[in-house]
Amino acid sequence: MEKQKPFALFVPPRSSSSQVSAVKPQTLGGDSTFFKSFNKCTEDDFEFPFAKTNLSKNGENIDSDPALQKVNFLPVLEQVGNSDCHYQEGLKDSDLENSEGLSRVYSKLYKEAEKIKKWKVSTEAELRQKESKLQENRKIIEAQRKAIQELQFGNEKVSLKLEEGIQENKDLIKENNATRHLCNLLKETCARSAEKTKKYEYEREETRQVYMDLNNNIEKMITAFEELRVQAENSRLEMHFKLKEDYEKIQHLEQEYKKEINDKEKQVSLLLIQITEKENKMKDLTFLLEESRDKVNQLEEKTKLQSENLKQSIEKQHHLTKELEDIKVSLQRSVSTQKALEEDLQIATKTICQLTEEKETQMEESNKARAAHSFVVTEFETTVCSLEELLRTEQQRLEKNEDQLKILTMELQKKSSELEEMTKLTNNKEVELEELKKVLGEKETLLYENKQFEKIAEELKGTEQELIGLLQAREKEVHDLEIQLTAITTSEQYYSKEVKDLKTELENEKLKNTELTSHCNKLSLENKELTQETSDMTLELKNQQEDINNNKKQEERMLKQIENLQETETQLRNELEYVREELKQKRDEVKCKLDKSEENCNNLRKQVENKNKYIEELQQENKALKKKGTAESKQLNVYEIKVNKLELELESAKQKFGEITDTYQKEIEDKKISEENLLEEVEKAKVIADEAVKLQKEIDKRCQHKIAEMVALMEKHKHQYDKIIEERDSELGLYKSKEQEQSSLRASLEIELSNLKAELLSVKKQLEIEREEKEKLKREAKENTATLKEKKDKKTQTFLLETPEIYWKLDSKAVPSQTVSRNFTSVDHGISKDKRDYLWTSAKNTLSTPLPKAYTVKTPTKPKLQQRENLNIPIEESKKKRKMAFEFDINSDSSETTDLLSMVSEEETLKTLYRNNNPPASHLCVKTPKKAPSSLTTPGSTLKFGAIRKMREDRWAVIAKMDRKKKLKEAEKLFV
């Protein structure tokens, strides 16, 4: 082993803070082996353990410690160079002056260099291991970040598609809610139709309308709501049975109407017979009246004969009345006067007994006349009873005829006026009865007349009862009409809503509805003919059908009219009740008066029996009777006039009755015609029902097909949604697991980073200690520089030829266009992250004179591509250190991109060393200059390493693209 010759690296002073040029000397440009040996020796002997730092791919300094950033790594090179120069000068001077002193200095420096190399080997091994770990962790973090970004994009796409699916589900839910609402409406329509059928079962015309409405409703239900096929079939069957029942009921009603018509015809014939009988009876009554008049004339003649005797008796009666008045006064005053009057009465009785014998003969004749009158009265009573029975039968029949309300109300008013007149007459008659109480004959005639008036009153009562019954029937009719109106209005409103909702589905059925409306119009016309009183109502109903918007107003008007009618009816009822009460009161008064009159008559009879004894008094009474006979004849004339009036009234009543019978006959004929029309309509309705049944069958088949299709579609959608939900759940589970793993990895990496920071702090402290030692060595070297300036150039040239060549590692493709000196630390001195320019400072020239042979190191400007890459690198990576190996291109003088320093990560250099079967420690060992130059990296190997790295990056990019495409395809399949 030959001794290494002393060598020194002369570095000129730094021209600027931005660039340091490293250029080979022009004289020795062709001798490449010289520089190779020099580089090799410098690499083996002066690799510092503290001078290398890792740079990122974009050339960023990753050292996060600000203390290290302040360290200027180029002065370290100057220190080493100066120390080597001083060491070399010392050796040269030692040849001349003291070889022993120089050898000692050299040996010391050599030992220190060996110690530094050993410490460097250990620290570099540790740092390389840590940096390899850090780089692996960085790659993992970058891959995880890319995966997270891809997952985020995928999650956003999935979220968008999920939102679209949710909106579609919401739309489906809305459609389902709409169908449910329609189903509820259908159920309500079914319930309402059932209620209407129950209401209109008892009426023929309304049952037909309900029949047609139900058929229309069934067709609407089938076309509009396909999902309710089973319910529609059940309702159809039920309605079919109901229609059969209704048809049977209609036939039954037709038979009943025919029977009623026959019965009414028979009744009319009976009424005509009864009218003839009544006319005969009236003729008999008129004949009896004439006979009674003759008898009255005879009685008047007899009364004229007896008038003379009666005058005498009347005079005596006046005297007796005066005496009776005196007696009454005396009876009130004292009892003594009564006894005297009793004695006078006994005397008078004796005289009357003689006179009674003469008057008995006259009384017998009068009794015979009375018996004849009583017989006539009994005959009248029997006729009156028969007439009452006939009137009752007529009342029952007239109750059935419900169309005479207005006429009867007018008659009621007339009869009420007649009743008032009759009440006045009764009052007059009561006065006359009080006047006729005094005489028995007069009272008998008045009783007869009162009986006749009672009969008339009873007839009026019968008419009142008939009118009351008719009023009740009319009230029922009005109530039924009100119910019908309300039902029709509700039905019209309901059907108008249904028509608005189902216009699109019921275009084919509009023709049928128009036909039905025409039938309804015909029926309404028939109802007009049948019921003249309800003509206004039917016109309003037609207007309601034509103008649905005006229905409400017309209904309100009708309701007001009905209320007015009800009020009038209530008023009439109140008036009738009031009249009834008055009649009852008058009857009671008449009965009381009659009872009183009967009692008075009995008393008078007793008095007559007593007074028959008094002949003189009877003669006076006969005179008075003659006078009263003339008055009675006048009254009889008055009564005859009244009887004539009553006969005229009877004739008018007969005429009215005839008119009523004619109207009934006309109504019966109209009803027959309407029944024929209705039968024709029933046949048409049957034909329409058969057609509807056929349509229902066809619609049922269509409903089944559509329902099957809808069920299949819904099942497909359900399966697809279930699959989508399962896949999304699995993806979410995977994402959660990946996130947990990443969080755990981040935590571990943070722990490792904290440990590395602690180690770096310890390394910084050691560096500071070594710097202090080197400063001491510099001071010692400066003292020796003054004596060795002249000999320095020659010795350095000879030494440079002998020194081995060393390669600095170069990887131009890891970070292009950046040059860094070997074992120098790249530190970013306060410059921004977007403008990371790495400044290389040249060593200060410690010598007084510049050296002719020197290297210039230039740092180029950053290209645009590097700036773009710097933006994407995270902040944490910019603060981490990274060691780099440098290699110079010695064959060039310029500072072009090929001459500039390039950086290669320590991790890749280690890989190349392992591939070349060179352990990492061999790169760090100390070698003598006599050994063969073994360059660790060649230009071909560096190109291979760059190509391999590119291939790996391309593979990773292709794999990432394939994964993205697969994920996108899977996400698209979920929503197809």
From Swiss-Prot:
Start and end residues of each stretch annotated as DNA-binding: 784-976
Motif residue range(s): Mediates head to head self-assembly of N-terminal ends: 101-111
Cellular compartments annotated: Nucleus; Chromosome; Chromosome, Centromere
Protein name: Synaptonemal complex protein 1
GO molecular function, one term: double-stranded DNA binding
Phenotype upon changing Y721F: Enables C-terminal tetrameric self-assembly at pH 8.0
Effect ascribed to mutating V105E: Impairs self-assembly of N-terminal ends. Abolishes the formation of higher-order heterooligomers with SYCE3
Tissue specificity field: Testis.
GO biological process, one term: homologous chromosome pairing at meiosis
Positions of the UniProt region annotated as Interaction with SYCE3: 206-362
GO CC, alphabetical: autosome; central element; chromosome; chromosome, centromeric region; male germ cell nucleus; synaptonemal complex; transverse filament
Gene name as annotated: SYCP1
Effect ascribed to mutating H717W: Enables C-terminal tetrameric self-assembly at pH 8.0
Origin species: Homo sapiens
Pfam family, one: SCP-1
Quaternary state and interactors: Structural component of synaptonemal complexes. Homotetramer that consists of an N-terminal four-helical bundle that bifurcates into two elongated C-terminal dimeric coiled coils. This tetrameric building block potentially self-assembles into a supramolecular zipper-like lattice to mediate meiotic chromosome synapsis. Self-assembly is likely initiated by local proton density at chromosome axis, which is predicted to trigger antiparallel back to back assembly of adjacent C-terminal ends into tetrameric structures that anchor to chromosomal DNA.
Protein's UniProt keywords contain Lyase: no
Highest classification ranks of the organism: Eukaryota, Metazoa, Chordata, Craniata, Vertebrata
